[in-house]
């Protein structure tokens, strides 16, 4: 798999080849990247304002900065914000970590004047060009994502709509201007091979607004036609409704060189969570892209994303950077006193113009990459590289047990392994739907005598320690192999429950270990490539709170 995600595979125009994406050399390529959420389309929760805050979209943020600091300050604030949020240092860091692509969510108001007449914004395209140039210099493909269409496409705050109405599908002017924007993007970037593809609409039509699904299908037809009149080479990415989790719009293949994109949050990290999309991929003979995902514990990241890649599905992690965030790859610290701004957004006292400017200046300074908190455990988990803790139930796709029986959690029931609750864990207090959201890691793998199971990780430096977390009641012996080579053995005494260093691993770009139970049975809780331990971020619900 390593060669499919390596940055050395970033070469030439990407294209669709059946259910695969291939690069300019005809080699299979799996996008593995991050998204610049909050850069060109701000969201309140990414400023640590909390869910449900009135100030939750760019047009309201613009009003907020004016209210706090005055028009003169506000006029200069947004250029500084965009100059600082994504810099060349960010791009270099993303490439150095080993990602191969970025997704740029775009608000139409960055590139197109919010006026009845069609008028493009030169400075917006210059900013986009600058980022694309940096990506090309550093070997990162760029997915252009229309996150906020003219008038809004979602029916929520995330598209910078005025009032949570998807006017793209109601007002003809919004519809035509959005098509013209895509024509302009195609004209500008048709010859840029580093542009991976065009993500036509982010998460269209949620909730009651799905009644416009037929109009969404028409828009996709019209938009593909408009782009193909100008650009016949770039891939086109198509998303479904309901946060890109509903496949109802996929009644046909919209373009031969298109990719089906879905988004995944709060799902079980198991094949069952991907099955609907894999069936769709097979039906239309098109590749899949997990175009947005995140918000969980590192163990969930490494379980879900490696599974996606092993199923032939590219992954994009949301977001790269966010304010005061526990489990982001990169977190800009909230300034001391930031709660004064947050309190004002919730109806509290105005901090005063001078104090507000002071806080916002520090906010801008903190978002420079060199001032951000880098969370190596999150990055390691997303990339499944040392140091990383892999839950026992996150075994490789294709590993097959002998003695398993279906479990009541519908978790990897086709694997042939027995999966059960860890000792001392009780999930009866959870509503049935929440097992996938907050407590899937209460499950563990039972490895019985005569069974083996495989785990893969990337970028293993020489001498990386291997730790096994397991317990047994009657005692067990475990052999660990790399290929046919026996690396080490582990003996567990009766009633043993331990985390043991087993051996040191050889250097490898990609390393697959096979663990074989040669005597007895054991509960295999985790395999640790390096000295990573269980994350202490708490439950999913706790993770949702900012620092």
Residue ranges and their predicted role:
Residues 1-99:
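N-terminal carbohydrate-binding accessory modules
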Residues 7-14, 173-323, 331-340:
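Extracellular glycoside hydrolase catalytic/binding regions
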Residues 30, 39-46, 269-270, 325-326, ...:
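Short, solvent-exposed loop/turn elements at domain surfaces
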Residues 67-96, 361-381, 436-449:
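Alpha-helix-centered segments that form part of catalytic cores
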Residues 75-102, 117-148, 156-197, 226:
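An active-site-proximal structural segment forming one wall of the substrate-binding cleft
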Residues 108-119:
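Glycine-rich, proline-tolerant flexible connector loops at the mouths of alpha/beta enzymes
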Residues 314, 321-389:
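Extended, alpha-helix-rich binding/interface surfaces that flank or overlap catalytic cores
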Residues 369-547:
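Extracytoplasmic
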């Amino acid at each position: 798999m390593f060669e499919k995600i390596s940055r050395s595979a970033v070469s030439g125009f990407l294209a669709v080849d059946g259910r695969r994406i291939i690069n300019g050399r005809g080699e299979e390529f799996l996008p593995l990247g991050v998204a610049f959420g909050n850069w060109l389309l701000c969201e309140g929760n990414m400023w640590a304002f909390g869910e449900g805050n009135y100030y939750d979209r760019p047009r309201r943020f613009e009003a907020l900065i004016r209210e706090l600091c005055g028009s003169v300050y506000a006029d200069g604030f947004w250029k500084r914000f965009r100059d600082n949020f994504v810099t060349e240092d960010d791009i270099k860091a993303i490439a150095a970590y080993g990602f191969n692509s970025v997704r740029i969510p775009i608000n139409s108001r960055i590139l197109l004047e919010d006026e009845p007449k069609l008028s493009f914004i030169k400075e917006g395209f210059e900013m986009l060009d600058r980022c694309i140039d940096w990506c090309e210099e550093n070997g990162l493909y760029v997915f252009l994502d229309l996150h906020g269409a003219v008038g809004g496409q979602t029916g929520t705050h995330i598209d910078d709509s005025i009032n949570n109405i998807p006017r793209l599908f109601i007002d003809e002017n919004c519809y035509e201007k959005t098509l013209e924007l895509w024509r302009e993007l195609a004209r500008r970037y048709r010859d840029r091979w580093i542009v991976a593809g065009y993500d036509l609409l982010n998460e269209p039509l949620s909730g009651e607004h799905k009644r416009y699904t037929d109009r969404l299908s028409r828009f996709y037809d019209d938009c593909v036609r408009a782009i193909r009149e100008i650009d016949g080479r770039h891939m086109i990415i198509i998303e479904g409704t309901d946060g890109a989790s509903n496949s109802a719009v996929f009644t046909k293949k919209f373009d031969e060189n298109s990719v089906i994109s879905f988004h995944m949050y709060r799902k079980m990290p198991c094949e069952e969570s991907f099955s609907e999309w894999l069936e769709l991929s097979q039906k239309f003979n098109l590749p899949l892209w997990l175009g947005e995902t995140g918000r969980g514990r590192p163990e969930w990241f490494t379980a879900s994303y490696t599974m996606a890649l092993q199923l032939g599905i590219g992954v994009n992690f949301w977001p790269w950077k966010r304010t005061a965030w526990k489990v982001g790859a990169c977190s800009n610290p909230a300034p001391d006193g930031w709660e004064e701004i947050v309190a004002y957004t919730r109806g509290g006292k105005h901090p005063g113009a001078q104090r507000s400017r002071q806080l916002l200046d520090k906010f801008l300074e903190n978002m420079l990459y060199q001032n951000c908190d880098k969370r190596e455990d999150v990055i390691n988990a997303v990339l499944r590289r040392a140091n990383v803790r892999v839950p026992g139930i996150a075994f490789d796709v294709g590993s097959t047990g002998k003695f398993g029986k279906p479990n009541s959690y519908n978790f990897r029931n086709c694997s042939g392994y027995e999966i059960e609750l860890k000792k001392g864990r009780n999930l009866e207090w959870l509503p049935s739907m929440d097992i996938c959201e907050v407590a899937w890691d209460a499950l563990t793998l039972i490895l019985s005598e005569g069974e083996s199971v495989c785990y893969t990780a990337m970028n293993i430096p020489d001498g990386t320690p291997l730790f096994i977390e397991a317990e047994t009641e009657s005692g067990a012996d475990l052999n660990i192999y790399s290929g046919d080579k026996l690396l080490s053995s582990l003996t567990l005494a009766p009633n043993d429950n331990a985390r043991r260093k087993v051996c040191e691993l050889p250097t490898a770009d990609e390393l697959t270990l096979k663990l074989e139970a040669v005597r007895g049975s054991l509960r295999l809780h985790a395999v640790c490539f390096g000295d990573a331990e269980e994350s202490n971020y708490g439950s999913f619900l706790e993770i949702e709170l900012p620092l």
